[in-house]
UniProtKB/Swiss-Prot annotation:
Organism: Porphyra purpurea
Family according to the record: In the central section; belongs to the AAA ATPase family.
One function term, GO molecular function aspect: metalloendopeptidase activity
Protein name (record): ATP-dependent zinc metalloprotease FtsH
Subcellular location: Plastid, Chloroplast thylakoid membrane
All ranges on the Lumenal side of the membrane: 29-118
Residue intervals on the Stromal side: 1-7, 140-628
InterPro entries: AAA+_ATPase, AAA_lid_3, ATPase_AAA_core, ATPase_AAA_CS, FtsH, P-loop_NTPase, Pept_M41_FtsH_extracell, Peptidase_M41
Active site per UniProt: E435
Function: Acts as a processive, ATP-dependent zinc metallopeptidase.
GO CC terms of this entry: chloroplast thylakoid membrane
């Protein structure tokens, strides 16, 4: 284990203190050299004077500023041998020197050694200095640590990252797929650069702009681009950084942030994930959070307290606009809400072109094909897709990406890591029939999405996969399309039952059944696509953590609930009958496709449709995916 010098210092401090006391008590220097002359016996000062009067004292050495004497004496009581005796002298004995001189006693005075005084001074000062220094070090360390005692006076300061000249490295040309949002923010940039063009006609720029959209759609990237284009001071902070463990810190940080913003106007204040502090007040199972609500109230006050054209523009981002407080969204605070949604085909193509600039690709790679293959992908998903393809290209020791790496990367991003191929067995043949059942129904139904490929290569939790790619970006879905999807999802289970019998039906269709039940129930309760009629029977706002639907009962009667269940079962039952009929009518082509799938493990959509056409007619669809 490697220890830092700070850790070693902290551990050595108590050891040093113990060693210092041991040295002082046992090995430390004395103030004089009397220790080398200490006699084996002692006597009182009065007895010493008697020896002096009797003439037994021959020599006296004075130590410790005449406080101690070492006496050499000879007498009958001492066995007529020279004895060295220690005598403690009184503080005031002026007659002693006179008596010693009259008795012709050798007298010598020994002054204290200068080195002993130095050691004594150091001994007295060293420990306090070490103690004070150690405490100062610990205090400074805790002062610099996050959340330490020294931070108490700085809790109310804003933690916003400040850049006098926003060096985000991002401009509008680096942001693709959100053209509508870029047009909205172009006005903001123009105001920051040329405010007089707005004020001249009495216009007021919005004080706040709220970016709303799913994760990964580029909200934060768009804010960076605005700062990079405008070239003004840029403050950025996360909503969770306002609130701390101490009461009042959040409101204080809001005040400090807007004070700095006004001092540096014109500028941009970007608050990411504002739902952390802007959530609706007074809601939830346990009531409101007082500290968070104080912070929100201060934020509302600061935003509404701006003067008309101070040049401070607040931009916030969230993917939970439905939980924000209504007072935060009113005009005068966040005047505009800019939706940054998942890009359509053109948006995906533009995003891919941006991220492909620094990627080496073969000339045969079609970004248009990739864009059509990836409906529902966000900008972050597309960036990750090309990065995964680049990593796979390097792993395969290729110099440039091909469609093979991109196809594999799409499968990995959507379905997970590739597993070990299945061995030839009854289980593999059953899975093959299951997947071919999905694919052949999807190919023969007019309103179903076209098959992109069928594979037996496991990915994630799936032992086999059938890929369907929508013909376009579908924002509206018809009843026929939903029913076709239900029939297609039931195709795998129908194939298992028809080919292997009811007793051999497996659990492989569990996820399919979940999707089927969900789609059928939404047809009845949400979309009004059943015999019940055009009614919305879905519970509205049933989120107890936002104070919605607390203790609320059902909005319809038990009879209606029973009818809903009946309609759901009827829809699924009719679709299942149609799925089994298609499987029975196309058993021959299914057997051929299963044998081919077991042999190749993957059949591309074009090849699949070509084989099916040899046996039956296929409805015309928009097939745009080229074969990889």
């Amino acid at each position: 284990m490697k220890l830092s010098w700070k850790t070693l210092l902290l551990w050595s401090l108590p050891i040093f203190v113990v060693g210092f006391f041991f040295w002082q008590g046992f090995l430390g220097p004395t103030t004089t050299d009397v220790g080398s002359n200490i006699a084996s016996s002692r006597m009182t000062y009065g007895r010493f004077l008697e020896y002096l009067d009797m003439g037994w004292v021959k020599r006296v050495d004075l130590y410790e500023n005449n406080h101690t004497a070492i006496v050499e004496a000879v007498g009958p009581e001492l066995g007529n041998r020279v004895q060295r005796i220690r005598v403690e002298l009184p503080a005031s004995a002026p007659e002693l020197i006179t008596k010693l001189r009259k008795a012709n006693v050798d007298l010598d005075a020994h002054p204290p050694k200068s080195t002993s005084a130095v050691w004594g001074l150091l001994g007295n000062l060293l420990f306090p200095l070490i103690l004070v220094g150690g405490l100062a070090f610990l205090f400074r360390r805790s002062n610099n640590a996050s959340g330490g005692p020294g931070q108490a006076m700085s809790f109310g300061k804003s933690k916003a990252l400040f850049q006098m000249e926003a060096k985000t490295g991002v401009v509008f040309n680096d942001v693709a797929g959100v053209e509508e949002a870029k047009e909205e923010f172009q006005e903001v940039v123009t105001f920051l650069k040329q405010p007089e063009s707005f004020t001249a006609v009495g216009a007021k720029i919005p004080k706040g702009v709220l970016l709303v959209g799913p994760p990964g759609t580029g909200k934060t990237l768009l804010a960076k681009a605005i700062a990079g284009e405008a070239g003004v001071p840029f403050f950025s902070i996360s909503g969770s950084e306002f609130v701390e463990m101490f009461v009042g810190v959040g409101a204080s940080r809001v005040r400090d942030l807007f004070k700095k913003a006004k001092d540096n106007a014109p500028c941009i204040v970007f608050i990411d994930e504002i739902d952390a502090v802007g959530r609706q007040r007074g809601t939830g199972v346990g009531g409101g959070n007082d500290e968070r609500e104080q912070t929100l109230n201060q934020l509302l006050t600061e935003m509404d307290g701006f003067e008309g054209n101070t040049g401070v523009i607040v931009i916030a981002a969230t993917n939970r606009a439905d939980i924000l407080d209504s007072a935060l969204l009113r005009p005068g605070r966040f005047d505009r809400q800019v939706s940054v949604d998942v890009p359509d085909f053109r948006g995906r193509l533009a995003i891919l072109e941006v991220h492909a600039k620094n990627k080496k690709m073969e000339s045969k790679v079609s970004l248009e094909t990739i864009a059509r293959r990836t409906p529902g992908f966000s900008g972050a998903d597309l960036a990750n897709l090309l990065n995964e393809a680049a990593i796979l290209t390097a792993r395969r020791r290729k110099s440039a990406m091909t469609m093979s790496e991109i196809d594999t990367s799409i499968d990995r991003v959507v379905a997970g890591l590739e597993g070990t191929p299945l061995i030839d067995s009854k289980s593999k043949r059953l899975i093959a029939y299951h997947e071919v059942g999905h694919a052949i129904i999807g190919s023969l139904l007019e309103h179903h999405d076209p098959v992109q490929k069928v594979t037996l290569i496991p990915r994630g939790q799936a032992r086999g996969l059938t890929w369907f790619t929508p013909s376009d970006d579908q924002s509206l879905i018809s009843r026929s399309q939903i029913l076709a999807r239900i029939v297609g999802a039931l195709g795998g289970r129908a194939a298992e039952e028809i080919i292997f019998g009811d007793a051999e039906v497996t659990t492989g269709a569990s996820n399919d059944l979940q999707q089927v039940t969900s789609m059928a129930r939404q047809m009845v309760t949400r979309f009004g696509m059943s015999k019940i009629g055009p009614l919305s029977l879905e519970s509205q706002g049933s989120d107890p953590f936002l104070g919605r639907g607390m203790g609320g009962g059902s909005e319809y009667s038990d009879e209606v609930a029973t009818n809903i269940d009946k309609q759901v079962r009827e829809i699924v039952s009719e679709c299942y009958k149609e799925a089994k009929k298609i499987v029975k009518d196309n058993r021959v082509v299914m057997d051929r496709l299963v044998d081919l799938l077991i042999e190749k493990e993957t059949i591309e959509g074009n090849e699949f449709r070509h084989i099916v056409k040899e046996y039956t007619a296929i409805p015309e669809k928009n097939y745009y995916i080229s074969q990889f």
